[in-house]
């Protein structure tokens, strides 16, 4: 099994997952158990995709799937922001910036493949 913890994209995705866990803890009950759960699950799934892509010979298809997962996460985060899940706009913007940074790294990795 290939090492993945040294990858910048993995570290960024891990930081995002930890950040989401901390933020969702402070959501209202409604948002915590609906959109919050989806955000948490998707952030963990993004980590799994990165590990799978690092270990696979067919990396391109997994990175394309990761692109879709990141888009799904962006939509969920925006929906959560628009419906009042995030405490403030700054919290949402921080998450959005992290996702964009991961997406850029994914595109660079995809170009190399």
Task: Indicate where each model-derived feature is located.
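Amphipathic alpha-helical assembly/interaction segments
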Residues: 1-113
């Amino acid at each position: 099994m290939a090492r993945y913890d040294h990858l910048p994209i993995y570290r960024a995705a891990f930081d995002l997952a930890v950040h989401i866990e901390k933020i969702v803890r402070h959501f209202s009950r409604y948002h915590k158990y609906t959109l919050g759960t989806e955000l948490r699950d998707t952030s963990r799934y993004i980590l799994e995709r990165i590990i799978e892509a690092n270990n696979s010979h067919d990396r391109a298809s997994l990175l394309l799937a990761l692109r879709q997962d990141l888009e799904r996460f962006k939509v969920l985060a925006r929906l959560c922001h628009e419906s009042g899940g995030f405490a403030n706009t700054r919290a949402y913007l921080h998450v959005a910036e992290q996702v964009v940074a991961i997406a850029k790294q994914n595109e660079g990795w995809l170009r190399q493949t």
